[in-house]
Design a protein with these regions (language model features):
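N-terminal presequences and immediately downstream first alpha-helices
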Residues: 1-21
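Conserved beta-strand hairpin/beta-sheet module of binuclear metal-dependent hydrolase folds
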Residues: 26-92
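Residue-identity detector for glutamine
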Residues: 22-25, 83, 161-164
Length: 166
């Protein structure tokens, strides 16, 4: 064993220290700092939740909550949001929605929430457009204009064939 490996073995392994004993249950919020709440939404996969954040906010003088990310569009997430609105928002509406990126667990409920509260969605143009492209994908045969586009973008013949075969 080298001296470096022996020294590494003697080091104490770091541990995680959690500031809260339990995470919030879906449909509830836990205040982590003044004006900031931590929420969790369920996910139907191995990673069974996404952390979502609420920040006290005001738009045009009306108090509300800005949220960061929305959860995946599932019946369970919809039920959790409804429970939050009934119990944990102090009667305040959502004022704006920030989506960090276009993965379905981060942006999946954005449409429903923006319509329900008539608030704006904030995300980068690139993430928004990528999301729109992916939701427009019907799973049908690759369109000719898509093949031309990707060919002009420099995709190899193998990559284009993979795109066609999807």
């Amino acid at each position: 064993m080298t001296e470096t490996a022996a020294a590494r073995d003697r080091l104490e392994k770091p541990t995680l220290n959690y500031p809260f004993e339990q995470p919030p249950q879906p449909g509830s919020a836990l205040e982590v700092a003044p004006g900031v709440v931590w929420m969790r939404m369920p996910l139907p996969m191995m990673l069974n939740h996404i952390n979502i954040w609420g920040i006290e906010d005001a738009v045009d003088g009306e108090a509300g909550w800005a949220i960061v990310d929305t959860g995946m569009r599932t019946d369970e997430t919809l039920a959790a949001w409804r429970q939050l609105f009934a119990n944990a928002t102090d009667g305040k509406k959502l004022s704006r929605i920030f989506c960090t990126h276009m993965h379905p667990d981060h942006v999946g409920m954005a449409g429903w929430l923006t319509k329900k509260f008539k608030c704006r969605l904030w995300m980068t143009r690139l993430e928004y457009l990528n999301c729109r492209v992916l939701t427009a994908d019907t799973g049908r045969e690759a369109p000719d204009d898509g093949i031309v586009f990707y060919h002009r973008a420099g995709w190899s013949d193998a990559a284009i064939e993979n795109y066609r075969a999807r």
